[in-house]
Amino acid sequence: MTQPGQTTTTSHEAIDAFKRIVGDEHVLTSERATMPFSKGYRFGGGPVFAVVRPGTLVEMWRALQVSVDNNLIVIPQASNTGLTGGSGPGFQDYDRPIVIISTHRIDEVHLINDAREAISLAGTPLTHLTDALAKHQREPHSVIGSTSIGASVIGGIANNSGGSQIRKGPAFTREAIFARVNDDGKVELVNHLGISLGDDPEVALDRLQRGEWSPEDVTPAPEDSNETEYAEHLRKIVPSPARYNANPEYLFEASGSAGKLMVFAVRTRTFPREVHPTVFYIGTNNTHELEEIRRLFLEADMPLPISGEYMGRSAFDLAEKYGKDTFVFLKFMSPALQTRMFSFKTWANGLFSKIPGIGPTFADTVSQAMFSVLPNQLPKRMMEYRNRFEHHLLLTVSESQKAASEKMLKEFFAEPEHTGEFFICTSDEEKSASLNRFGAASAATRYAALKRRHIAGLIPIDVALRRDDWNWLEVLPEEIDDQLEVKAYYGHFFCHVMHQDYVAKQGVDLEALHDRIQHLLEERGAKLPAEHNYGRIYKLPESMEEHFKELDPTNTFNAGIGGTSPHKDWA
């Protein structure tokens, strides 16, 4: 059996073919050179035969043809965020060598229909799309969060990323252009982009990259709005989750494909940019008060808030201490610079990982030491609330909703049984609160990396709770709690999507503990995962496995995802 990193005569021929297509410098084969692509941000990592970095859609198409002709497993990768390890290989019993086709160099955006829609090519990062739309007073589906680690537009679509924008729902489109490998093992191009590009694959992809089409070649845009049908779906307080990765309503071709197709471009809606939103910072020691506020706003006869983000005190503290570098870069510099620094950190960690006594977290250790000398970066009122309240909610509303929302909150907290408080953020407090909330995920990862010699590891849980669940914040049994060093809770509260990070004590069986926590959540009617997809840590349900088999009948793409067979033809 050929292992992922092994080579054969045929494999050498494939390397030569890749080099003819993309150039020698864009075909990586050494362990050090491929590690930034093969090792995930949190999970995943294993040997690969090669990383190929095409610079055009046509090169991408040709590299795929070579891979299929040489019986290689193909992992399409736009941005190796690897939150659950799904953007790279795992340590599985693969029967073919693995090639990662990294699309990072293909990052163009084409705005169409008066910027009401965007065509994002294979490797377009969210930061590029955000910048392109800002000139037109528009914004994409995702506004902040995964943008800070360089996440891509297509990665969001492929994984049904939800994000903080509660009016918009999961990242989803029915319009994409992609390649699949059919039952006969042949590569075919499918153009469902809604743009006529011709029948020849290479001509079509070249025209797409150059934006060469006329207005009559493009189907009309949908009606403009600052929300999708998800908004009304979310308002229903019913015993089922609002959104989760296995929801069939959000699985269509590229959407939710999890790397089981080679996606060249997606067409997505854009939204009017929010001008002068208001952020209410809410603190309480009673979880039911936050749920009452959630239902109050969901049931109100007014537009939904823009976002409602939860953060517990433990997550707050982790973000303040271990996410300070991310906070500073994003607050005082730019997401684009943070993305470059993230890439540099990954490269540096890979470079120093083989040096005895240094290990795989060199860049994290240096960054943590440098930024720890800075004083606390958070505003005074936020720190006061941190000391007084266990639970924090960042409620963001449109300018037109400010007065009504403030009135609702004042009346709510005026009732004697309610013990929490709120304040309206200044512009500085608004930015700081948002960055601290979205720094929580990277902070938990940083903490676990720096403490790796003294802990068993990190268990991240990504869960969609029932929309009617009053007891949304779990209380773990003592026998589980005793196995944990740290636990942190944060999430998209109005959607009842929680991110729950657990750092397990040394000697704990991580897989068994993960399964136990997942079982407890599922007993409560929750669905896992919610928005980070299955990757290498969640087992696919049968319905998802059948869906992936329809997309990829020969198991050419991202084989082994979600605990499925890594073998050809799903053997």
Swiss-Prot record:
PROSITE patterns reported for this sequence: FAD_PCMH
Gene3D superfamilies for this protein: 3.30.465.10, D-lactate dehydrogenase, cap domain, subdomain 1 (3.30.70.610), D-lactate dehydrogenase, cap domain, subdomain 2 (3.30.1370.20), Uridine Diphospho-n-acetylenolpyruvylglucosamine Reductase, domain 2 (3.30.43.10)
Induction of the gene: Constitutively expressed.
Pfam families linked to this entry: FAD_binding_4, Lact-deh-memb
Topology within the bilayer: Peripheral membrane protein
InterPro entries: D-lactate_DH_C-sub1, D-lactate_DH_C-sub2, D_lactate_DH, FAD-bd_PCMH, FAD-bd_PCMH-like_sf, FAD-bd_PCMH_sub1, FAD-bd_PCMH_sub2, FAD-linked_Oxase-like_C
Source species, domain of life: Bacteria
EC number(s) recorded for this UniProt protein: 1.1.5.12
Keywords from the named record: Cell membrane, FAD, Flavoprotein, Membrane, Oxidoreductase, Quinone
GO molecular function: D-lactate dehydrogenase (cytochrome) activity; D-lactate dehydrogenase (quinone) activity; FAD binding; quinone binding
Temperature-dependence annotation: Optimum temperature is 45 degrees Celsius.
Catalysis: reaction(s): (R)-lactate + a quinone = a quinol + pyruvate
Gene Ontology CC entries for this record: extrinsic component of cytoplasmic side of plasma membrane
Record's subcellular location: Cell membrane
Domain FAD-binding PCMH-type: 44-273
pH dependence, record text: Optimum pH is 7.0.
Gene disruption: observed consequences: Inactivation results in the loss of the ability to grow with D-lactate.
Binding site for FAD: 78-82, 86-87, 145, 152, 162, 263
Main location: membrane
GO biological processes: lactate metabolic process; respiratory electron transport chain; transmembrane transport
Cofactor(s) required, per the database record: FAD
Family, per entry: Belongs to the quinone-dependent D-lactate dehydrogenase family.
Summary of the function given for this chain in its UniProt record: Catalyzes the oxidation of D-lactate to pyruvate. Also has weak activity with L-lactate and DL-2-hydroxybutyrate. Electrons derived from D-lactate oxidation enter the electron transport chain. Essential for growth with D-lactate as sole carbon and energy source.
PANTHER family, per the entry: D-2-HYDROXYGLUTARATE DEHYDROGENASE, MITOCHONDRIAL
Protein name, entry field: Quinone-dependent D-lactate dehydrogenase
The organism of origin for this protein: Corynebacterium glutamicum (strain ATCC 13032 / DSM 20300 / JCM 1318 / BCRC 11384 / CCUG 27702 / LMG 3730 / NBRC 12168 / NCIMB 10025 / NRRL B-2784 / 534)
Lineage, uppermost ranks: Bacteria, Bacillati, Actinomycetota, Actinomycetes, Mycobacteriales
